[in-house]
Amino acid sequence: MGKFPLREQSIVLIGFMGVGKTTIGKTVAKKLYRDFIDIDEEIEKRFKMPTKDIFRLYGEKTFRNAEKDIISEICQQRLKVVSLGGGAFLQKEIQEICLNSSIIFYLDLSWDRWKDRIELLMESRPVLQGKTMKEMKQLYEDRKPIYEQHHSRVDTDYHEIEEVADYIAESLKLAWDIYEPTS
């Protein structure tokens, strides 16, 4: 897995939109002394506008192509913590890039816990705009099997950001010590 030693491979966080990938990713990056990159923010920088405007003006296809290009570029770098947008991992090419070059953590939040966050998510998530609760649940269910392509799954239900970040950092350190001992 990957062209870099395990200790240097980038860490990629995947999961449904709004599960905390960005917040947890920033915390993990601090704990591991790595740079944090949010793919959606990188796309927004390139287009110089928010994601919802990119979707509206250029369409989802243009957004997804930019997403693939940026992920491909960033996953070839070492020592990063990367947060993918909720829909990024739906692209087979992105799955292959990430699985072959990085360590992937799937942040799994149950539907019931995710529903509690809907109010906070609606404005900033173009994919949710105009959807009923039933349609959102279907989207959640449809994407869940895709996220099963990972190296490690983390159940985030009822866990604080710090707890999840500690778990990820400690499990990585353990894996590094087992598979690449320093002495």
Curated annotation (Swiss-Prot):
Pfam families: SKI
Residue pairs linked by disulfide bridges in the UniProt entry: none
Name by which UniProt lists this protein: Shikimate kinase
Co-factor(s): Mg(2+)
Top-level enzyme category: transferase
Note on how the cofactor is bound: Binds 1 Mg(2+) ion per subunit.
Residue positions binding ATP: G18, V19, G20, K21, T22, T23, R125
Chief site of localization: cytoplasm
A GO MF term: shikimate kinase activity
Organism: Oceanobacillus iheyensis (strain DSM 14371 / CIP 107618 / JCM 11309 / KCTC 3954 / HTE831)
Annotated metabolic or biological route of this protein: Metabolic intermediate biosynthesis; chorismate biosynthesis; chorismate from D-erythrose 4-phosphate and phosphoenolpyruvate: step 5/7
Binding site for Mg(2+): T22
Record bears the keyword Nucleotide-binding: yes
